[in-house]
């Protein structure tokens, strides 16, 4: 049994970054990528489960995670890709568009023979994970979750990212130990802009 402090699960993302002048570049992104750097910097033994199309299969191996600690999944669709179009030079306002979304990470795709203190779901948009993956992982260790992976949804016509409430939140919140949400996401979840009240409601769930 291979043991990790943190096991991070998510999609590789090919980011397109456009500045306010419309000039652009592509970069490797995704919460699973950046979270692995942060977890390693904290001295943790880190494993990652990362999903992409076959043509991007080798990209995760440039990460500082040891090769034997990278578990790659084949996406049945494309590699997730997101465009961030910044509207000002300070990068404070932007339009985010889903160019492609990888296939859902399912319970059946979780690797065998590993255990972790924390399983981090580093999602990018709704549909990244099969919902029941939360309950399954909570039986194995503590679950950490970024709410953008459950609230952020591509608009069917424009593909711009919009936010919708999670209708199964009260069913799954008791299985989450570490929850990351910003003020806007917390208001969508709870219906209140009062941060303390929003935090209280989420803890009660």
Residue ranges of predicted features:
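Histidine-anchored nucleotide/phosphate-binding helix
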Residues: 31-41
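Conserved phosphate/ATP/ADP-binding segment of small-molecule kinases
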Residues: 152-205
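Anionic group-transfer/hydrolysis microenvironments
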Residues: 13, 124, 148, 184
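Conserved N-terminal subdomain of the carbohydrate kinase-like
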Residues: 2-5, 14-26, 41-122, 127, ...
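Short gly/pro/ser/thr-enriched loop/turn and capping motifs at secondary-structure boundaries
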Residues: 79-80, 150-153
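Short internal beta-strands
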Residues: 48-52, 144-148, 180-183
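Active-site metal-binding loops of divalent metal-dependent hydrolases
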Residues: 10-12, 31
């Amino acid at each position: 049994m291979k043991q990790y402090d943190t096991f991070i699960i998510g999609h590789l993302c090919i980011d397109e970054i456009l500045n306010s002048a419309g000039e652009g570049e592509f970069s490797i992104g995704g919460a699973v990528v950046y979270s692995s750097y942060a977890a390693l910097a904290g001295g943790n033994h880190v494993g990652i489960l990362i999903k992409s199309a076959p043509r991007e299969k080798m990209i995760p191996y440039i990460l500082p995670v040891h090769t034997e600690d990278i578990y790659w999944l084949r996406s049945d669709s494309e590699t997730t890709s997101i465009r961030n179009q910044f509207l000002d030079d300070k990068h404070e306002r932007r339009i985010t568009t889903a160019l492609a979304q990888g296939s859902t990470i399912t319970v059946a795709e979780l690797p065998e023979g590993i255990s972790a203190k924390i399983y981090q779901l580093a999602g990018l948009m709704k549909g990244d994970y099969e919902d029941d993956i939360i309950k399954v992982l909570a039986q194995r260790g503590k679950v950490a979750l970024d709410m953008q992976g459950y609230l952020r949804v591509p608009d069917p016509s424009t593909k711009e990212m919009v936010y919708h409430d999670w209708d199964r939140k009260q069913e799954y919140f008791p299985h989450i130990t570490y929850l990351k949400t910003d003020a806007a996401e917390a208001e969508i979840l709870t219906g209140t802009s009062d941060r303390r009240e929003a935090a209280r409601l989420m803890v009660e769930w």
